């Protein structure tokens, strides 16, 4: 079994961005082709870069945690992402940002460091059975997502500290420069285009205002939900960055195939086996229904194999409605394979009576004659 990205970097699933970066820098230096002659260095270096490329990005990491390693890779390959080919980042580029943190250099990411960013929406696939879809149900689901930091309450700033307005751009996030007839606008170099500055980032969330954890959530599945229904839970998605609004959670419903019923909109179809005696003579038969229990169905005398009998308002419930669909029973007349002596005698008598009736009315011979005329 191949290693997942956390195992490749040697960190836990709850590792912070600082821990990820530290692990990446250590491994990148160890396996970079410019620093070692080991045979498998290039392969390991590619794997390390692929892992860090995903986990350093909050949205990619959330998708990776949600889908799992194999499913995420398949999705990336279909979308054309995640293929680094033979490209090797320069060793100086890898450690440039690392050294600038200590030296106050200008090698800084252009990614916003203080701006509020809305959290990503999440998708959860939930499978239920047909009875649960009929009655409706409360389901507890478990998933990993970014949650608002409970230490800084999403601000990204250390407790007691405030997020200050950038004095270089007055909170605009950009500066303007006049060159002749042209005005050039560029991102503020001091706040990186955000308009605000976090002087002391929160230690728990490293200034992001959120961190990843496993969540348990109770979701309500309404009665009459159909296969493929998407239910939106506002604000239950990824927490926003630095106080940004949370995304939404979308629960996609899949209904498992049923052993007895087939669903057609709000109607239910089922195969109903009956004896040839009941088919001929008619009668009452007990039929199971989706809400539980049984109801009586009248079988008309002379019912044929393949006939369809309807039980009104015994189908599926409809969302936000008191109306129900129907249940349609498809008759399957069963012919006995093993007859007792008495049963055979009775059928022989029935056979003779049937032949005599057809001979008397001439219908049988007329039909045969017409076949040869």
UniProtKB/Swiss-Prot annotation:
Annotated protein name in UniProt: Chaperone protein DnaJ
CXXCXGXG motif repeats: 149-156, 166-173, 188-195, 202-209
Signal peptide: none
Top-rank taxon: Bacteria
Positions contributing to Zn(2+) 2 binding: 166, 169, 188, 191
Keywords: Chaperone, Cytoplasm, DNA replication, Metal-binding, Repeat, Stress response, Zinc, Zinc-finger
Taxonomic lineage: Bacteria, Pseudomonadati, Pseudomonadota, Alphaproteobacteria, Rickettsiales
Family annotation (CDD domains): DnaJ, DnaJ_C, DnaJ_zf
Pfam families: DnaJ, DnaJ_C, DnaJ_CXXCXGXG
Protein's cellular compartments: Cytoplasm
UniProt keyword Transcription regulation present: no
Organism field: Rickettsia rickettsii (strain Iowa)
């Amino acid at each position: 079994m191949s290693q997942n990205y956390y195992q490749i970097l040697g960190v836990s699933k709850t590792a912070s961005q600082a821990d990820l970066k530290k692990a990446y820098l250590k491994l990148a230096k160890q396996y970079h082709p410019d620093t070692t002659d080991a045979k498998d260095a290039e392969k390991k270096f590619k794997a390390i870069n692929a892992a860090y490329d995903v986990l350093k990005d909050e949205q990619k990491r959330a998708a990776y945690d949600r889908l799992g390693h194999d499913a995420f890779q398949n999705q990336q390959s279909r979308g054309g992402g995640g293929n680094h080919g033979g490209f090797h980042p320069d060793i100086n580029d890898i450690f440039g940002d690392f050294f600038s943190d200590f030296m106050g250099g200008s090698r800084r990411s252009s990614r916003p460091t203080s701006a509020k960013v809305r959290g990503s929406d999440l998708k959860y696939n939930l499978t239920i059975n047909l009875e649960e879809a009929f009655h409706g149900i409360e389901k507890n689901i478990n998933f990993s997502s970014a949650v608002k930091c409970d230490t800084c309450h999403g601000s990204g700033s250390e407790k007691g500290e405030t997020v200050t307005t950038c004095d270089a751009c007055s909170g605009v996030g950009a500066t303007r420069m006049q060159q002749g007839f042209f005005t050039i606008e560029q991102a503020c170099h001091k706040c990186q285009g955000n308009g605000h500055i976090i002087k002391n980032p929160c230690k728990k969330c490293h200034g992001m205002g959120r961190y990843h954890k496993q969540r348990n959530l109770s979701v309500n599945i309404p009665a009459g939900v159909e296969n493929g229904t998407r239910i939106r839970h506002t604000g239950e998605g990824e927490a926003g960055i630095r106080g940004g609004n949370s995304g939404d959670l979308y629960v996609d419903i899949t209904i498992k195939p049923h052993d007895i019923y087939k669903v057609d909109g709000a109607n239910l179809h089922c195969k109903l086996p009956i004896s040839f005696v009941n088919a001929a003579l008619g009668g009452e038969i007990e039929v199971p229904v989706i809400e539980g229990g049984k109801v009586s169905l009248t079988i008309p005398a002379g019912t044929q194999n393949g006939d369809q009998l309807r039980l009104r308002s015994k189908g599926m419930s409809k969302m936000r409605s008191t109306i129900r669909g129907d249940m349609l029973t498809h008759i399957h007349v069963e012919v006995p394979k093993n007859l007792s002596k008495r049963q055979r005698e009775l059928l022989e008598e029935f056979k003779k009576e049937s032949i005599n009736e057809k001979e008397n009315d001439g219908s049988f011979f007329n039909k045969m004659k017409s076949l040869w005329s």
